[in-house]
Swiss-Prot record:
GO process annotations (BP): mRNA splicing, via spliceosome
Superkingdom per UniProt: Eukaryota
Entry-linked InterPro entries: Beta-prop_RSE1/DDB1/CPSF1_1st (IPR018846), Cleavage/polyA-sp_fac_asu_C (IPR004871), Quino_amine_DH_bsu (IPR011044), RSE1/DDB1/CFT1/CPSF1 (IPR050358), WD40/YVTN_repeat-like_dom_sf (IPR015943), WD40_repeat_dom_sf (IPR036322)
Any Gene Ontology CC annotation: U2 snRNP
Native species: Aspergillus fumigatus (strain ATCC MYA-4609 / CBS 101355 / FGSC A1100 / Af293)
Known partners and oligomeric status: Associated with the spliceosome.
Pfam families on file: Beta-prop_RSE1_1st (PF10433), Beta-prop_RSE1_2nd (PF23726), CPSF_A (PF03178)
Family: Belongs to the RSE1 family.
Protein's name according to its UniProt entry: Pre-mRNA-splicing factor rse1
Free-text function comment from the UniProt entry: Involved in pre-mRNA splicing and cell cycle control.
Length: 1225
């Protein structure tokens, strides 16, 4: 397969995966505070929990460009800092540390032990670390185990030994943990099955008799050798191990979790067993056994406990009682094992208990949760079951025990962290008529599923909204003295006057402030140590601390049209075009500079920068004129008001703002001039602090209204508030320091300013029509806003109404009782027992029952009602599997909703009692559905599509065309076009692209005259297709179950032959090639994403931009592929990729090129995620790479962040947000 391509795409992640595969806890910063490290796909993220506010904030995130299989934290004895061990697919063990001063991960050790990739005999699947940090064991699923001794050298640096082998061939490992043995030789416990005899026995008897063993491996530190110390049979269904505290804290050993029971085991102790309690209720099956799927052990002073979770989400508190000696001291001998119901939380992939009294739940599906412990469940009335009442003998079954689930009593939910995992389907539509479309998704599972609206923006918290007596034109806040912490006044300017409000416990009008109330205000500033100034059209009022006022009147027949101020300088522009400059003297008076500067046109705006630390003045004044220019004037005493530079603009400037902001290119701060134009365009340009030259201009269109700019403070950093038809915030990314421009999720404002009070330390005050609004921005780390609407069951497909802003979602849950069955069981229970407790399914899930399906169709209104407005339940154990909106020509092109269902479907191995195609008519503008009829088919119709006024259905391997009849669908044409199962359909004209579950895509042409379907081209590679979209008439983009994205194109000759007029006889009789179609598709691009693509869209994310491909992944990933338009850009990014891969290789040791070529060589794709790692590099590395590429650092960063414009097309991504956060939509 050729790896070069004549087509290149730039692959970029808009939102990284939100599914957390593992989370660990530790003091990674070396302080007493605990941090959480999570693995999401290839992303490693460290989070800071805030116990005072009950919030979790991500600090730093890095793509390791590899599959993170397992994580573990460890601490060397005597140290205060935890290190992180990563088990990945690189065939290497990686030890990293978090460096808080640089806010980055630093790799300490990288030791190779085997082949790369996820293989059953290459260690990396299991990782266990001795609690004292002396050794770690990394193991594979089968055979291989390696022990590394961890120590420190004379320089107190972490060292790692050569690996010690503990291999055992033909042995499968199910779980592994380290024992807590204090400072004795480290011991590791594993659940193993030896399959050597079963492998040689064709009768299967050896397999039936095979035992699962709990095995101890001891590392002898003296002999530097690993021995298999102890092995004992355990329950064959055992699947998890949990470490029991040892030494002075407990008896050591492990908890072995199996189906329906938990057993305490240790080599020198008796076994103790308790059953896992089962739910009791009208809809619960009392015979269903539970298993433990997650858990956590927490040590407190003098005590410890476990929280173990079943597949229902129920948490059980498990404790161990120990025997006491005559003095009442614990002996370390176990007396009993106890278990009781604690609370119910979402099913977790990881559970973490923080020392500050919080529980972190990394959910398997849906949002992650952060709980606070209200109590530990010691004094409640829950029944406690202990091992004294149950036999420890494995051959004797435990009697089942039951508990009654209830609402949360011990845990209080304090924060929910958004997660799109699993993301099933999406649509990209601009329903709000914003400047960018919204992404609508269906995600989650069971009763915790949701329909979500994603849009680009920052979340705003409104504090106050107050109506004013008339419409103000501007608002300011000011302190009374420089030393004040909070603002004292809000000044409102009206067309005929000025209103001053004092800020205190209440906001009220004040009149004795010295401000002129009979004229509108142009600027307000706290000047010097303790004075104020007010600029109005007729002059400048300098209000001293004792309320004395010095007035500077404007010259006769002239007025002030613009003003700029800082704490020491004032500049005003007169209607005659003159600039008058004032500077504060040593005695605190405002002195006018002798000369005035005459500008060539009318001045529209001015700006003075802040006075730098240790300086007495800002060096430059920016002047915007109506001749569409911006001039930089010097304010130095030697060259006051001299012209330093000029920049021509496309429109007259409406606002200017000089401010110093963080700069990713230099690592420090840089002076920028922000420019707003009357045309709605915003520009940001670098202002040289020495020469005053303007360079490196970036542009963005913000809206139809003139842009106004205001300097504000958000989360401790200086930012620019840009107001046009909607508000925007320009700020520095927390991680990369790159400039980001993001819209605010707020009403359009006419004016804005900083606001600081005791109640709102960092806020903003704004004007919207006749309203005064005070608001704040809480988070800068997430700029994708989500609105969520709960759904009933796991969504399978979504569809937008052809005309109305409504969505239709088909949902189905396997092994779940249908609503009708649940209602019947509850009624029966009420008749027998009276009142029945029905638990909310969003917290407790639906009752399970093997072989049952719960399925429905829901209509969602995301704009007006923002809720599900109608639900149609499917009966007779049918499960909805596909959906399409089809206009039928035979019904005057009326559009019907067509839903495909499967009856009595079994997922694995796949089987069903056939399928049905339901027809629904849209009523009430799509808000209701009227059932027409349903047609039985032999297999579930997994793909449906409207095609030339009829219905195209993929049923098994058969492609079929139906028309609408009175009582059922009428079969018009069919052909077997694929070898296995049709899972997707796309069409343009008479061409149909058919996706097969495991044989990629096949192009089929429909010949109308002869009413036949003819496959004429297919793929040379078997791809397990999950989603496809037609990019053009000959090209298809697709994704597969192994995480690949690809683009295939039909050969031009085959395409032309298929479109020739006539019967297509030559296509029918053309000889097939290798049991397939006569022709093969050409592969254009191919890359590996590490997430399963669930939907693909050809769309525009910027109004007027060129088409790009947007894809969504199962784990919540949203990414895009942007086509390159120039070979020069391709060459630049290919060279940058190579430099980055060699200068900063991936953290976990995986080779980047091999990673992106996991199943097939990467072709025609530039990895934008790797390119954006450039932002995170130290400055010296940036400069070294820039020198290799013969470019400047700023030029490279500009290339990465500002995608190319070509022949007048709109910039695809302007000031793109680094992928470490999220891309601008």
């Amino acid at each position: 397969m050729a790896t070069t391509s004549n087509m290149f795409m730039y692959s970029l992640t808009i939102q990284p995966p939100t599914a957390i595969t593992q989370a660990i806890l530790g003091q990674f910063a070396g302080t007493k505070e605990q941090q959480i490290v999570t693995a999401s796909g290839s992303k490693l993220t460290i989070h800071r929990p805030d116990p005072t506010q009950g919030k979790i904030t991500p600090i730093y995130s890095q793509d390791v460009f590899g599959i993170i299989r397992t994580l573990a934290a460890f601490r060397l004895a005597g140290s205060s800092k935890d290190y992180i061990i990563i088990g990945s697919d690189s065939g290497r063990i990686t030890i990293i540390e978090y460096v808080p001063s640089q806010n980055r991960f630093n790799r300490i050790h990288l030791e190779t032990f085997g082949k790369s990739g996820v293989r059953r005999v290459v260690p990396g699947q299991y990782l266990a670390v001795d609690p004292k940090g002396r050794a770690c064991l990394i193991a594979s699923v089968e055979k291989n185990k390696l022990v590394y001794v961890l120590n420190r050298n004379s320089q107190a640096e972490l060292t790692i030994s050569s690996p010690l082998e503990a291999h055992k061939p033909q042995t499968v490992v199910f779980a592994m943990t380290a024992l807590d043995v204090g400072y004795e030789n480290p011991i590791f416990a594993a659940l193993e099955v030896d399959y050597s005899e079963a492998d040689q026995d064709p009768t299967g008897r050896a397999y039936e008799e095979s035992e699962k063993l709990l095995v101890y491996y001891e590392l002898d530190l003296g002999l530097n050798h690993v021995v298999r110390k102890w092995a004992d049979p355990v329950d064959r269904t055992a699947s998890m191990l949990f470490q029991v505290p040892g030494g002075a804290d407990g008896p050591s050993g492990v908890l072995v979790c199996a189906e329906d029971n938990i057993t305490y085991r240790h080599s020198n102790q008796d076994a103790f067993r308790v059953p896992i309690p089962r739910r009791i209720g009208a809809t619960e099956n009392p015979e269903r056994k539970r298993s433990i799927v997650a858990g956590v052990m927490h040590k407190m002073r003098g005590a410890f406990f476990f929280l173990l979770q079943t597949e229902d989400g129920d948490l059980f508190k498990v404790t161990i009682d120990m025997v006491e000696d005559d003095n009442g001291q614990l002996t370390g001998e176990v007396k009993r094992l106890k278990i009781k119901y604690f609370d119910t939380v979402p099913i977790a992939s990881s559970l973490l208990i923080l020392k500050s009294g919080f529980l972190y739940v990394a959910s398997e599906a849906g949002n992650h949760h952060f709980y606070q412990f209200e109590k530990l469940g010691d004094d409640d009335e829950e029944t406690e079951f202990n091992s004294e009442n149950f036999p420890a003998d494995l051959s004797v079954p435990c009697e089942p025990v039951f508990f009654q689930p209830r609402g949360a009593e011990n845990l209080n939910l304090v924060e929910t962290l958004n997660s799109l995992n699993p993301l099933i389907d999406s649509k990209i539509v601009n329903l709000n008529e914003d400047d960018a479309p919204q992404i609508y998704t269906v995600s989650g599972s069971g009763a915790r599923s949701s329909f979500r609206t994603l849009k680009h923006g920052l979340e705003v918290s409104e504090i106050v909204e107050s109506e004013l007596p008339s419409v103000p034109s501007a608002v300011w806040t000011t302190k009374l003295t420089r030393a004040d912490e909070f603002d004292a006044y809000i000044i409102l300017s009206f067309a005929n006057g000025t209103l001053v409000l004092s800020i205190g416990e209440t906001v009220e009008e004040v009149t004795d402030t010295g401000f002129l109330s009979t004229a509108p205000t142009l600027a307000v500033q706290q000047l010097g140590e303790d004075s104020l100034i007010q600029v109005h059209p007729r002059g400048i009022r300098h209000i001293l601390a004792d309320r004395r006022v010095n007035e500077w009147p404007a010259p006769q027949h002239r007025s002030i049209v613009a003003a700029a101020t800082n704490e020491r300088q004032v500049a005003v522009a007169l209607s005659s075009g003159e600039i008058v400059y004032f500077e504060m003297d040593a005695d605190g008076t405002l002195a006018e500079y002798d000369e005035r500067r005459q500008m060539s046109g009318t001045v529209t705006c001015l700006s003075l920068g802040e006075v730098p630390e240790g300086r007495v003045r800002s060096s430059f004044l920016a002047v915007g004129c109506d001749d569409s220019t911006v001039r930089i004037l010097s304010l130095d005493p030697d060259s006051t008001l001299e012209n330093k530079s000029v920049q021509a603009l496309t429109s007259a400037p409406s606002a200017l703002n000089i401010m110093s902001m963080a700069d990713s290119s230099s690592g420090g701060t840089t002076l920028y001039l922000h420019i707003g134009l009357y045309s709605g365009v915003y520009l940001r340009t670098v202002l040289d602090e020495v020469t005053g030259e303007l360079s490196d201009t970036r542009t963005r269109f913000l809206g139809a209204k003139p842009v106004k700019l205001f300097r504000v403070s958000v989360k401790g950093q200086t930012a620019v508030l840009a107001l046009s038809s909607r508000p925007w915030l320009g700020y520095s990314d927390i991680q990369t320091k790159g400039f980001m421009l993001t819209p605010l999720d707020y009403v359009g404002l006419e004016w804005g300013w900083n606001f600081s009070s005791e109640q709102c330390v960092e806020g903003m005050v704004g004007i919207q029509a006749q309203n005064l609004r005070i608001f704040s921005i809480e988070k800068l780390d997430n700029n994708i806003l989500q609105e969520s609407i709960p759904l009933s069951n796991t969504p399978r497909r979504m569809l937008k109404h052809p005309e109305q802003p409504l969505f239709y979602v088909i949902e189905s849950d396997n092994n779940v009782l249908s609503p009708a069955t649940r209602a019947r069981l509850i009624e029966d229970s009420k008749a027998r027992n009276g009142e029945t407790n029905v638990l909310p399914p969003e917290d407790f899930g639906y009752p399970r029952a093997t072989g049952h399906w719960a399925s429905c169709i829901q209509i969602v209104d995301p704009l007006d009602a923002k809720a599900v407005i109608s639900t149609i339940e499917l009966e007779e154990n049918e499960a909805a599997v596909s959906m399409a909106a089809v206009p039928f020509s035979s019904q005057d092109d009326e559009t019907f909703l067509v839903v495909g269902t499967a009856k009595d479907m079994i997922v694995n191995p796949p089987s069903s009692a056939g399928g049905f195609i339901h027809i629904y008519r849209f009523q009430e503008d799509g808000k209701e559905l009227e059932f027409i009829h349903k047609t039985k088919v032999e297999e579930p119709p997994l793909a449906l599509l409207g095609f030339q006024g009829r219905l195209l259905a993929g049923i098994g391997s058969t492609l079929r065309i139906y028309d609408l009849g009175m009582k059922q669908l009428l079969r018009k044409c069919q052909a077997q076009v694929v070898s296995k199962t049709i899972v997707g359909l796309q069409t343009q004209g008479s061409r149909i692209v058919v996706s097969d579950v495991r044989e990629s895509v096949t192009y089929v042409v429909y010949k109308y005259q002869d009413n036949i379907l003819i496959p004429f081209v297919d793929d040379s590679v078997s791809r397990w297709t999950t989603s496809t979209t037609m990019v053009d008439y000959e090209t298809v983009a697709g994704g597969d179950k192994f995480g690949n994205l690809w683009l295939v194109r039909c050969p031009k000759k085959a395409s032309e032959e298929a479109d020739e007029d006539g019967s297509g006889a030559h296509l029918i009789h053309e000889r097939g090639y290798l049991h397939g179609a006569p022709n093969r598709l050409d592969l254009m691009i191919h890359t590996y994403t590490q997430d399963i693509p669930t939907s693909l869209h050809k769309t525009q994310l910027v109004a007027g931009g060129r088409d790009i491909l947007v894809w969504t992944g199962f784990q919540g990933t949203i990414g895009m592929l942007v086509p390159f338009v120039s070979r020069e850009d391709v060459d630049f990014f290919q060279n940058l990729e190579m430099q980055l891969a060699s200068q900063c290789p991936p953290l976990a040791g995986r080779d980047h090129l091999i990673y992106r070529s996991y199943y097939a060589p990467v072709k025609g794709v530039i990895d934008g995620d790797l390119c954006e790692m450039y932002f995170l590099l130290p400055n010296d590395t940036k400069m070294m790479i820039a020198a290799e590429l013969d470019r400047s650092v700023r030029e490279i960063e500009r290339k990465i962040s500002v995608r190319y414009a070509n022949e007048g097309s709109v910039l695809i991504i302007l000031m793109a947000i680094p992928a470490s956060v999220c891309k601008g939509l």
